[in-house]
Amino acid sequence: MFAEQFANVRAKSPLVHNITNYVTVNDCANMVLACGASPIMADDAAEVEDITTICSGLNINIGTLNSRTIESMLKAGKKANALGHPVVLDPVGAGASALRTETAYRLLDEVRFTVIRGNISEVKTLASGAGTTKGVDADVADRVTEENLDGAVAFAKAFAAKTGAVVAITGAIDIVADGAKAYCIRNGHPMMSAITGTGCQLSALTAAFLTANPGQPLEAAAAAVCAMGLAGEIAHARLTPLDGNATYRNYIIDAIYNMTPAQLEEGAKYEVR
């Protein structure tokens, strides 16, 4: 089923506007290129509306938040809404500071998001203020496991229904849900957590998939999550004893670049709830 979503990205090569963080911006741009789309990484408030206008989708990531980019995110998000473009929110570290949490709430209040993608602690913070974010990582107390999966799926569906956005909660088990349906995805490898920015790259990848698949936000987001996880598996299989997390990062991008829609279809590991 996900082969079609990936094939559309390669066929349409959509232009995606990313207002992302300075730690991972280069990797995010390369991830968008690897999947077959084109990135623009513009974050000055004086031009974001113009850039959003010439693009077909927007990815907002609050990882290295500052007062200058908050204005840029709000302006770009509102312009994307006016144009009917899909918008992704990656609320990196929501709950870790008042600025991050308040900005995430303001973005949710003023911008209509197509997909909200974060770890379980970040998404819990957005939903209720109850997440226990550990920096930009999910706290152990929040993490999704087989034992609490039913509750996590119900939570994701409820938050999706409340916001009108597809909710993508990523971790050892990924959940991608709208108000009625959820994909529980088991692709990926534990070593992905040793790389800074795999979540940021996934949000950029999700924006590309959304932009190429209008009207299918749930399936597009689930396809992107499966693709990223499968890339982590493929990349890990290439590692030698002398390779570390830097090599692994490059191999993940290579795996997306070389992945075919048929490989994604065959390698996606998910169930529907």
Task: Please give the residue ranges for each predicted region.
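Glycine-rich phosphate/adenosyl-contacting loop at the front of the ribokinase-like
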Residues: M1-M41
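Active-site cofactor/substrate anionic-group-binding motifs, chiefly glycine-
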Residues: M31, C35-L89
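Glycine/small-residue-rich loop that forms an oxyanion/phosphate-binding "nest" at active or ligand-binding sites
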Residues: T69-G118
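Conserved phosphate/ATP/ADP-binding segment of small-molecule kinases
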Residues: T101-A182
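Short pre-catalytic strand/loop immediately N-terminal to key active-site residues, enriched for Gly-Thr
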Residues: R186-T196
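Conserved post-catalytic alpha-helical subdomain immediately downstream of the catalytic base
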Residues: T196, L205-Y248
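Charged C-terminal helix
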Residues: L230-R273
